């Protein structure tokens, strides 16, 4: 072989500078792959914490706007309280001495 283009030297030994460069390059790639895999697993486990860091804080306009589900639950609670008060008023208007009874007849 002529010149320094080949892997083998003049005495038949392997040029170790090429192998050292190859080993360093593969070690760097291996480290990059392992670090990126570790970061991916961390991001997968702590998704909410990471999203909280990058989320924009809410403005005053969105704070004044009520949450839809909170509004629904408050409306439902108000309806239940109104029905309860109506039933209590109805119970107090009925005389207490009359017992509700149902008569069944078999024919």
UniProtKB/Swiss-Prot annotation:
Q: Give yes or no: UniProt keyword Transmembrane.
A: yes
The answer to whether the entry has keyword Membrane is yes
Disulfide bonding pattern of the chain: none
Q: Name one GO cellular component term.
A: membrane
Q: How does it sit in the membrane?
A: Single-pass membrane protein
What InterPro entries does UniProt report for this protein, alphabetically? Answer: SMIM19
Q: Where in the cell is it found?
A: Membrane
Any stretches that span the bilayer, and where are they?
25-43
- Main site of residence? membrane
Sorted alphabetically, which keywords does the UniProt record give? Membrane, Transmembrane, Transmembrane helix
Which family, according to the similarity comment?
A: Belongs to the SMIM19 family.
Name it.
Small integral membrane protein 19
Q: Which gene encodes it?
A: SMIM19
């Amino acid at each position: 072989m002529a010149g320094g283009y080949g892997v083998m030297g003049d005495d038949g030994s392997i040029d170790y500078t090429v192998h050292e460069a190859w080993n360093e390059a593969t070690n760097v790639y291996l480290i990059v792959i392992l670090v990126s895999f570790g970061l991916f697993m961390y991001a997968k486990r702590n998704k909410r914490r990471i999203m909280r860091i990058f989320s924009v804080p809410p403005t005053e306009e969105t704070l004044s706007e009520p949450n839809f589900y909170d509004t629904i639950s408050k409306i439902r609670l108000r309806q239940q309280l109104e029905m309860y008060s109506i039933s209590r008023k109805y119970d107090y208007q009925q005389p207490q001495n009359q017992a509700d009874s149902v008569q069944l007849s078999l024919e």
